[in-house]
Amino acid sequence: MTVWIVFEYADFINEIIGVYKEKEQAEKVHKEFPKWRYIEEHEVQ
């Protein structure tokens, strides 16, 4: 299964904003603050 994790840049450690099963949901959250957030795709078993 593929999941998308949205991170937000922080001072010392990047924070996880959320983990999503659908890419569209992750992109929606990312667009709220596109300069401060990024998405990573991960395969989980």
Language-model-detected regions and their locations in the chain:
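Short, mixed-charge low-complexity intrinsically disordered segments
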Residues: A10, N14-E15, K31-Q45
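Short aromatic-glycine-(Arg/Gly/Cys) micro-motifs in beta-strand/loop hairpins
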Residues: M1-I16, Q25
